[in-house]
Amino acid sequence: MPRYRSLAVAIVSAVGLGWAVAALAGSGQGGDHAGSGFGYHLVKTVALGAPNQWDYAVFSPTTRRLFIAHGNRLTVVSAGTGRVVGQVGPIPGGPHGIAFDPAANLGITDDGRLGQAVIFNLHTLKIVKRVKVQRGADAVTFDPVSRHAFVIDGDTGEIAVVDPVRGTVVTFIHIGGDLEYAVPGNNGELYVNGVTHREIFRINTATNRVDATWPIPQCRSPHGLSIDTRTHRLFSSCENARLVVVDSLNGAVVTTLPIGRGTDSDRFDPKTGLIFSSNGLDGTLSIIHEVDANEFVAEPAVKTAISGRTMGIDRQSGRVFVVAAHTTRQTMDRFMAQRQKTHRWPHWSPFTPNSLRLLILDPGR
């Protein structure tokens, strides 16, 4: 995703400026939370504090902690208690993506402005190495087969391949165009969302070369990406409020399903067969049930909060985490009206100061 997109930027990129204001006018605050699909409901809200800048949220099964790209650090939250237990930082240029090498007890994030892969100890949270990569680094993912991290510059279409144990760059993969999230398969492949031409790239992680390019024309600006390795299905969430299901073996589009507006993350839970999309414009969590490889059912959405565009999931418990800052319809209307009038982004934030929070949702029991 672009660097620390505010809600307003996310809305404009998703639906266009004119539609954005109209959509906000009917959306309210997004402050009321109600459970629907599979009984998901809000159980806890955790204050994260200043600044109101955030990006990806990724759950570590090894430590049972959620890592959130937040300002100039990673904020670390216990998945069980919901308490903030530490930070990884400082990361002066701001982190975006997060990935883990659990066998080496390492985490990998990025400093986008300084162009660094930042490697840290998963348990002590101490930074152990900073590796020079490309400026504008954004999404980060880890391939368990090659044991390499992939640091994606979404704006230039370049991917740095990093060995986190050695703390070195292996190579750079140049794809070109705008890139978004990436997810590994089980057999040494990496799938990457291509925004510019609506496609998914498959990279062979042994050769670090693109060996397939698959069009997904139904998906305008693919953002989130997750995978069911058992059924060989990729799930790409799109800014035109669609989830596109793609065969990870041959790139065929299996189906498309409706989701909310303003998606920036999606996650798959293999335990339940549920696909989730966090939607910042609508302030909802879309839930889709994978019945089998070819049958998918869109379940009732669950209200979260306007701006809640990134998420994580604890696949052991089914607990879902959504990050959001508080804003109101009136504030966003004023913000967007000023943008329309001046054709520039206002120099003030549409969010209530120090209002960043983590919403924790559990399934029904």
Where are these regions (language model features)?
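Bacterial N-terminal signal peptides that target proteins for export
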Residues: 1-11
